[in-house]
Amino acid sequence: MRLIRAHRALEVLPTATVWLIITAPVWGALVIPAALGFGLVIFSLYWLWKSLVFASGVLIGFWRLHNAQQRDWIAESLALPGYEKLHHLVIVPTFGESEEIVADTLHYLALQDVALERVSVVLAFEERDPSAPARAQRLSARFAALFQHFLITFHQDREGEVRGKASNLTWAARRVQAELIDTGRLDPIDLIVSVCDADSRLHHRYLGALGYEVLSQPNGFLHIFQPAILFYANHWRLIAPLRALNSIYSLWELARMVPSHRLVTQSTYSLSWRAVCEVGFWDVDVIPEDSHMCFKVLFHFGRRVKVRPIFLPVYADAAEGATLRRTLENQYHQILRWAWGVSDIPYVALGAVRARDLPWHVRIMRVVWYVEEHLMWPSHWFLLTLGGLIPPLVNPAYAHSTLGMWQSSLISAILGLCLPCLLLVILVDWRLRPQHPDGEDSIDVLIGWASFALLPIVGLLLCALPALDAHTRLLLGRRLEYRVTEKVPVQARFRDQQAAPAMKPLGKLAPLRRARFDQLPQYRAYAPGSTTAVTDAVLLVYRDLR
């Protein structure tokens, strides 16, 4: 009972603090105007510091991303002991995604430059999806012979579980244990698990780089590995303001990988089978399964574990829908689900207390960084915009005083110094994002750059408000139901183009897998409408090679 009360208190405290912060420009201007002014000055300095860290992280991340794509990870791995025994297990949980969405992801797995005899795939469906058996059968027919093992699982809902990715992953992992490991078909000692979303396109060097990182690091089989998630796969299908917003999300994902000591996994990540088994698989009653699993492994193994970045891109779809309204709704609900990570604050805080094998300063800072992120997410917009607008309306006498005007001028000057950081980030985005399928003229470039000026509006509607929604639900004791982000079918993504991108001749499978990833049209390996034919051709070549 005491633990339950502590858990609930740790849910209420940060969420109530957020509401206290965002309403501070109103009540603070009336009760403690001078203290509010100095508080806003301090927050402005904090935001300038975060802007500098963000911009420098984007630059360093961009440089490391470029270098990592040039390295021959396989050649470097050959000299490491145990390389030939290493086996990759890729679990792809899916619910409701179309066959072509999942096939697109599997195509990119087939392009990996590691030997596919050392890659096994698990397609983890939900039993409640009525179309899952038919899609599973077709996907198995198209891809099963490409990999060492190709396992199909159907997660059955059970009492006490939360419908979502975590419970599906645990079900799939238990089926792997029963069907592949207990039967001796896979060796668990040298098995590396990668969790891959249904719309994630792995860079063709990712599994090779993952193997190198596992084998070259002390305690590599205990570490967790995080690639760079970039929401560029459907970049040009979105309207300009949403392109700007998702560019910021992509670059934030890249920048946060630079200070790896505070890195937490998200979406697509990798860890050893040993780590998965020793912590008892994924907890089936949580929604933010990625960060939760990260802390679960960290607290279990202690100082031996590190979360290590792999600076290779994983191209994912930004939230999209068949109409503009559906796109906005899907974007809102996706951010709401991400922000629901605030519900894990009690787990992180209480877990840090029990994790005696971690140094005390590491435990404290891990909690502080996690809480800081979730406090600033819903509140920063209100402080940056309304913090300077509301106090003069509520308390004009103080606003026109000498101290009030000095504080206002100082805040404006500090925030003005953040603009060069934003310009630098926009420039890196311009260099990093995919080229327009029809080419960009000067008008398109200007529209793209000008769309960043709408970030204050888009940031309120599709960043601050969904995060505040998550906090409010948790504060009121209302739980969130897992909602899968809608994916637009592969063919629909190209409906605005005059013709599908030309496809290169296949040749043999090995040269196909070694093709430069950044030369593939729109970061997709195959043209829409031809994926079945391509898979069949690759399948025939691969069968001949075997």
Regions found by a protein language model. Give the residues of each.
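Internal catalytic domains of large membrane-associated glycosyltransferases
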Residues: 66-343
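Long, K/E/R/D-enriched contiguous segments that form extended
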Residues: 309, 322-401, 428
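Low-complexity, intrinsically disordered or signal/transmembrane-proximal segments
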Residues: 519-526, 542
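N-terminal membrane-anchoring/stem segments of glycan-assembly enzymes
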Residues: 1-80, 424-426, 458-476, 486, ...
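Membrane-embedded multi-pass helical conduit in multi-pass membrane proteins
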Residues: 21-49, 369-476
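Hydrophobic alpha-helical transmembrane segments and immediately flanking/interface helices
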Residues: 109-121, 401-404, 475-498
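Loop-to-transmembrane boundary segments
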Residues: 2-14, 89-93, 97-102, 358-381, ...
